[in-house]
């Protein structure tokens, strides 16, 4: 009987040891990927394994639901880097189910939706993702109204896609008040003023953009626009 109990205890010890080792290996893999900057596909698989296979122990491992939400975001970001915008949107949405006020997740859904719309050919699908992009940027700004990336993104959509020039002007003015003066911003302001029929300010901002141009392509692009305006 003593021998039987000894065998049982040894088996239990080995079983617990293997389980602990498995968890430790998973944590080690995550740390190694974070440090080494491992590829997106590898990270996605590890993050999925962490969430799906270890779901029963998730609270013990990460200590809070917020950390679980973070892994949904990380998966979304890796899909985003791969240009797989549909799955990216799915995982950012999972994050928002836990943390609906995450302005970054709303922003990334907006960018992913916008990029997805640009690659589609079916009109209804394009409109669907353009609407999702706009609503996501607006939701991001409703949570944090000074988030520059969302301000620029919604302005870009309003100038080039939705022709909401007055709304774009308001957002661009806000970015200007915040000190933005990089090339892409100045070009967008020029395009906005041109669309509003204000050629004086359009030329002013295109001229400012030309001084910020850092590549030959940028310089030639501004030059072509300026020559057509004058």
From Swiss-Prot:
TPR repeats lie at residues 69-102, 183-216. The keyword Repeat applies. Pfam families: TPR_1. Keywords: Repeat, TPR repeat. The keyword Repeat applies. It comes from the Bacteria. SMART domains: TPR (SM00028). InterPro entries: TPR-like_helical_dom_sf, TPR_rpt. This is TPR repeat-containing protein BB_0298.
């Amino acid at each position: 009987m003593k021998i039987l109990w000894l065998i049982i205890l040894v088996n239990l010890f080995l079983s617990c040891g293997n389980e602990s080792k498995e968890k430790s290996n998973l944590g080690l893999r995550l740390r190694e990927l974070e440090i080494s900057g491992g590829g997106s596909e590898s990270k996605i698989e590890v993050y999925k394994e962490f969430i799906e296979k270890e779901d029963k122990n998730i609270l013990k491992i990460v200590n809070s639901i917020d950390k679980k939400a973070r892994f949904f975001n990380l998966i979304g970001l890796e899909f985003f880097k791969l240009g797989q915008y549909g799955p990216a949107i799915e995982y950012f949405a999972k994050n928002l189910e836990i943390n609906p006020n995450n302005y970054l997740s709303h922003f990334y859904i907006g960018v992913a939706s916008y990029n997805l719309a640009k690659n589609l050919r079916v009109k209804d699908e394009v409109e669907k993702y353009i609407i999702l992009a706009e609503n996501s940027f607006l939701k991001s700004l409703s949570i944090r109204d000074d988030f520059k990336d969302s301000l620029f993104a919604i302005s870009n959509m309003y100038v080039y896609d939705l022709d909401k020039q007055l709304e774009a002007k308001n957002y661009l003015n806000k970015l200007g008040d915040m000190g933005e003066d990089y090339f892409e911003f100045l070009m967008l302001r020029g395009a906005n003023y041109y669309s509003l029929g204000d050629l004086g300010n359009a030329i002013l901002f295109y001229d400012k953009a030309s001084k910020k141009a850092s590549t030959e392509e940028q310089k030639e692009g501004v030059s072509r626009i300026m020559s057509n305006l004058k």
